[in-house]
Amino acid sequence: MSQAPMATTPRNYPIFTVRWLALHTLGIPTVFFLGALAAMQFIRR
């Protein structure tokens, strides 16, 4: 991901904001769900 030349133009910040929003709305519940599944493996007796 060579995005260094694109960072010089100040018009690209909504694109990065939407990408950040999409990655975190999908990524944070996924990591939380995988952590919950991993925790359930240790809780099971």
Swiss-Prot record:
Bound cofactor: record note: With its partner (PsbE) binds heme. PSII binds additional chlorophylls, carotenoids and specific lipids.
Cellular localisation: Cellular thylakoid membrane
Keyword Lipid metabolism: no
InterPro entries named in the record: PSII_cyt_b559_bsu, PSII_cyt_b559_CS, PSII_cyt_b559_N
Keyword Electron transport attributed: yes
Cofactor: heme b
Residues annotated for heme binding in this entry: 24
GO terms (BP aspect): photosynthetic electron transport chain
Assigned keywords, A-Z: Electron transport, Heme, Iron, Membrane, Metal-binding, Photosynthesis, Photosystem II, Thylakoid, Transmembrane, Transmembrane helix, Transport
Gene Ontology CC terms: photosystem II reaction center; plasma membrane-derived thylakoid membrane
Subunit structure: Heterodimer of an alpha subunit and a beta subunit. PSII is composed of 1 copy each of membrane proteins PsbA, PsbB, PsbC, PsbD, PsbE, PsbF, PsbH, PsbI, PsbJ, PsbK, PsbL, PsbM, PsbT, PsbX, PsbY, PsbZ, Psb30/Ycf12, peripheral proteins PsbO, CyanoQ (PsbQ), PsbU, PsbV and a large number of cofactors. It forms dimeric complexes.
Function: This b-type cytochrome is tightly associated with the reaction center of photosystem II (PSII). PSII is a light-driven water:plastoquinone oxidoreductase that uses light energy to abstract electrons from H(2)O, generating O(2) and a proton gradient subsequently used for ATP formation. It consists of a core antenna complex that captures photons, and an electron transfer chain that converts photonic excitation into a charge separation.
Protein name: Cytochrome b559 subunit beta
Gene this protein is translated from: psbF
